[in-house]
């Protein structure tokens, strides 16, 4: 068998981006044959991706890309906050944000079939799972086209993209405001019906407990719903930089119109696994007693 040299390991790592020890093991198994070692690594990295697929990915990053009047916002998830700061992971997020903007995929499946260099997005994802050792998923994205765009990233965990006409500084202020105040819709009439129904139900329960006449209760409920709509609609919210005016008033003064926006928060709505270490230890002790 040919001796496995450091230069061979380095060459295989450059070709596959796999960890050094994995490269050395593959070369040893392939008896120094570089092509065979590459095949071995592809299988191993693919197996790692398969094993990781069931693990929850509630951490990650938001990446954005704007080029003129096209842009995209994407959420790429991983398992831990540590990996969300990995350079390869961050680079992948930025690459797919650019792809979404320039190639206009219909959904995540279509995005996964697009190419980054000589690899598909899915192949890069699988390779990175094998290299980093954590599951990662492209959760969602939003693409914009045909309008002025502004974006704001709060670190890498909150991202906003705003479509607008008018002043770019005002639009960027709106993006920052949205990241801080997290509106659910541009205006009151765009708030999703299911959210309004939920808020109305809560208001009805609270009002019913007051013991007041039905007509008063009805007014209390309607007042609560209207207050909620103002609180969660972007244009009606007090502007974060000057709460004496609403966002709508600020935009009017800046002769700017916001056409729409998208707000992504990493892991929003994903149920994270909670490790109960006390229960885990108790289970291990019980199992040990049964074996004794």
From Swiss-Prot:
Which InterPro entries does UniProt cross-reference here? EF-Ts_dimer_sf, Transl_elong_EFTs/EF1B, Transl_elong_EFTs/EF1B_dimer, Transl_elong_Ts_CS, UBA-like_sf
From the UniProt annotation, give the residues forming the signal peptide: none
Q: Which GO molecular function, any one, fits this protein according to its record? A: translation elongation factor activity
One cellular component term from this protein's GO annotations in UniProt: cytoplasm
- Pfam families, from UniProt? EF_TS
State its location(s). Answer: Cytoplasm
Region of interest (Involved in Mg(2+) ion dislocation from EF-Tu), residue spans: 80-83
First-listed, main subcellular location of the protein, grouped into a coarse class: cytoplasm
Q: Looking at the record's lineage, which domain of life comes first?
A: Bacteria
Per the record's keyword annotation, is Coiled coil included, yes or no?
no
What function does the entry list? Associates with the EF-Tu.GDP complex and induces the exchange of GDP to GTP. It remains bound to the aminoacyl-tRNA.EF-Tu.GTP complex up to the GTP hydrolysis stage on the ribosome.
Q: What is this protein called?
A: Elongation factor Ts
Give the gene that encodes this protein.
tsf
